[in-house]
From Swiss-Prot:
Keyword Ion transport annotated: no
SUPFAM superfamilies, A to Z: Retroviral matrix proteins (SSF47836)
Protein name as it appears in the record: Gag polyprotein
Lineage: Viruses, Riboviria, Pararnavirae, Artverviricota, Revtraviricetes
Superkingdom: Viruses
Length: 239
């Protein structure tokens, strides 16, 4: 009990300051709790599961007997234990206050347990294997596309079933209908309506006042122009 009293007194001085209870008051409280059957041993005081039953029992005793000395001492001790627990003090003495047992370090969680060297090597090998597999997956060529077919035949080889073509060319584009381009079929007919004039020959000009044909643009007679230029001679330049 003396060791427990010393630890609790140190905790109260740290977190309670001048209002810290004395070692005598702490010892009297522990003796009462053991007498009432609330503690099997003084070290049970470090367990948070025993705090609420102790608080309830001392509160009832204070109301019945009018003695609140032990309840006041317990309130200070409880405040110190909770403060140490909330702040998660890492010293060995603080761990003893928190009910982690005799100054021993609490067993770490599964994520904090250091694995043996053999397991670490195995885990490292698995990580390396996963990394290699991911790299190979990125470098591997894409899966060959299934040949495209129309109905049951392949575009490339025309096989109905069991096509072995790795890839097949896309189907040819549909034939562009005649509606997208102007038709030239009527051009020859229009040229031949005036008679048997061959294609490319000069069309007869419409006579003025002719009722049957619409007037068209006059064609330049380059042969006549050349004859006139030859007969007139070169122009005389005035000095």
């Amino acid at each position: 009990m003396e060791a427990v009293i010393k630890v609790i007194s140190s905790a109260c001085k740290t977190y309670c300051g001048k209002t810290s209870p004395s070692k005598k008051e702490i010892g009297a409280m522990l003796s009462l709790l053991q007498k009432e059957g609330l503690l099997m041993s003084p070290s049970d005081l470090y367990s948070p599961g025993s705090w609420d039953p102790i608080t309830a029992a001392l509160s009832q005793r204070a109301m019945v007997l009018g003695k609140s000395g032990e309840l006041k001492t317990w309130g200070l001790v409880l405040g110190a234990l909770k403060a140490a627990r909330e702040e998660q003090v890492t010293s060995e003495q603080a761990k003893f206050w928190l009910g982690l047992g005799g100054g021993r370090v609490s067993p770490p969680g599964p994520e904090c347990i250091e694995k043996p060297a053999t397991e670490r090597r195995i885990d490292k090998g698995e990580e390396v294997g996963e990394t290699t597999a991911q790299r190979d997956a990125k470098m591997a060529p894409e899966k060959m596309a299934t040949p495209k077919t129309v109905g049951t035949s392949c575009y490339q080889c025309g096989t109905a079933t069991g096509c072995n073509c790795a890839t097949a060319s896309a189907p040819p584009p549909p034939y562009v209908g005649s509606g997208l381009y102007p038709s030239l079929a009527g051009v020859g007919e229009q040229q031949g309506q005036g008679g048997d004039t061959p294609w490319g020959a000069e069309q007869p000009r419409a006579e003025p006042g002719h009722a049957g044909l619409a007037p068209g643009p006059a064609l330049t007679d380059w042969a006549r122009i050349r004859e006139e230029l030859a007969s007139t001679g070169p122009p005389v330049v005035a000095m």
